[in-house]
From Swiss-Prot:
GO terms for biological process: oligopeptide transport; protein transport. This is Putative oligopeptide transporter YGL114W. Pfam families: OPT (PF03169). InterPro entries: OPT, YSL-like. It is found in: Membrane. It comes from Saccharomyces cerevisiae (strain ATCC 204508 / S288c) (Baker's yeast). One of its GO terms (molecular function) is oligopeptide transmembrane transporter activity. The chain crosses the membrane at residues 28-48, 134-154, 254-274, 353-373, 449-469, 472-492, 564-584, 644-664, 697-717. It comes from the Eukaryota.
Amino acid sequence: MPQSTPSQEVQRVPWDNKPALKQITLRATIAGIAIGSLVLTSNFQFGLQTGWVSMMSLPSALLACAFFKNIWPLIFPNDRPFSDVENVYVQSMAVAVGTGPLAFGFVGVIPAIEKFLTNDESGGLREQGQSFTFRELLIWSTALAFFGIFFAVPLRKQVIVREKLPFPSGSATATLISVLNGTEILQEVSKSELLEMRQRRLNECPEVLQPNRDPEEADYLMNSSHSELGDYTATSQDGSSILSTGSENYRANIIILLKTFVVSSLYTMVSYFVPVIRSIPVFGKYLSNNYLWNFQPSPAYIGQGIIMGLPTVSYMLIGCFLGWGVLAPLARYKRWVPPDADVHDWEEGVQGWILWSSLSIMVADSVVAFIVVTVKSIVKFILIDDKAALLNNIIDDTFQSMLLEEERAINSSRRNTYVDGRQDTVRLVSRDNEIEVDSKHLVRYTTVISGCLVSSIICIVSIIYLFGIQVIPLYAIITALILALFLSILGIRALGETDLNPVSGIGKISQLIFAFIIPRDRPGSVLMNVVSGGIAEASAQQAGDLMQDLKTGHLLGASPRAQFCAQLIGACWSIILSSFMYLCYNKVYSIPSEQFRIPTAVVWIDCARLVTGKGLPDKALECSMILGVIFAVLSLIRNTYRDYGYGWILYIPSGVAVGVGIFNSPSFTIARFIGGWASHFWLKNHRGDLNAKTKMIVFSSGLVLGEGIFSVINMLFICLNVPHY
């Protein structure tokens, strides 16, 4: 009897036993920190330029798998195989490290306080332009690093195990990891979805319904049909296995990632020596000089547009035309701004004037969406029919037998598909049942409660140390933490249902609420407002990221406790690296500048000034109110009818996306729109190809990572005074 290879032993582990596999390892921890550091470097570049930060969970998982499949065996040939749950651990840690710039406020709150806050607005605590020291940045990051993680853990049972929110990115990452490692993935289906799967399979192969058909032939026909989850089988005429489709997809994705990374890196290097390519005046010099209508052929911005998708970038383009094609020329023509003011001037120029309209639209959209989601949740809770729930939870023998039949058909269709000796399989379970790992692999509630208390105390002590209890009183910090808890729930649910974590909107809601709590005439009210919003944003960002990763782990059978540890370790490393990178950018570059406009920071400080009673520029209030009302109504319609599946909902623009299109310069939006169109045509021409979207995300991730990581080389060139044109 032949002996099993190590990789085959991993394949044999059923889903229920996978949490017991060793996941917290030194090699996985080092890999997670390394990959996360690359993502963090990329996110800093684009966060300071446009305010855009990405989790990069899918490319992180792909890079981890590539390293441990191709490089690690050359160094340690006798080491145990890399498992899918260990891959989840690496990816979770990489996300925790990489999203530090946004979670810790280094692309918004910190530059807002440093660059724009006046001495009066800070309560006499800081001078405008006074930079934070490295020690202060470490303390600030530590204050925000942990409570969002502890807030999220108790919600896992509700949103993932019970409600089974889809978390599209987390589910896509789980599917990729399953295919790359050739292991079992959990597929939760409802009765209607199961019937659709069965009907589609039978329609594609009606011969299986013929009563006189030979059983073996019918079985072959069933296995050769395409399942709901895709067909990965490739066989020759004699039935022998030829090249594994899983391995082909893996190699193809790696090649795509490397090629796009190289192209984007080359653009970054060339843009240093020929900076004119960053801003090409394709619409003429007048529009370029007065309204910033340029084209920047940045591969990274095109990649961001691919990730965002056509609807979002279309809404941004609407905002771009509204802000820079209508409002800005109107304000200058009507002399609501000085005609000779610099277009880059956030105080006197058109850029500063249209920002108020952008802010009004985003706040109106966020507040209305928050109200609608809250009301829907309350109504849903009140109207639960216990009898109906009881009946739906009764085990239906027919349903269970159908589950087993479809599971067998799907996995049989993959019987010749191997990745390094392993086979990727599917385990179908009823969505009505709660599938959970053993309690010993869950985070203990004593850990959660003590962690919430300790992290909250760390936050309180750190904020008081940095700003003083006279400027930011104790009750304000405690209120911000309590508010952060509730807003984290909103962020998690929004991310789970729409794949979008509205952290910017959550921060604005927090600022708006604090405007009613803190007296406007209190010294330091603007600083207090910004800090409280930063606390809420950090909590929502971390809680959403962790829940997305927990969804990935749940589908693959990873240990929630191991992922929790990965998030904590990643946050600890991100504290140090984020603080260091911000210090480097601050010393090497002039911020704000045309290259690093820090638009998110401007939005933070202007929102704080708005809600604390500062006067607006001429006619900005009237314009902001009109647009705010319009987009509040649109937000009400979109969020009320979003769950009904109406096609026309897609044509109602998102206020947040429109607002982003207004405050970002046109060059950023145009490049992203090109990326959005590219993704639309790609998916349209590859309908039915389940690997098409994965390849598209890998393609775009390579573009983003290449330019982001090689921006460090450009930073080094500046430090060395390397000449350029």
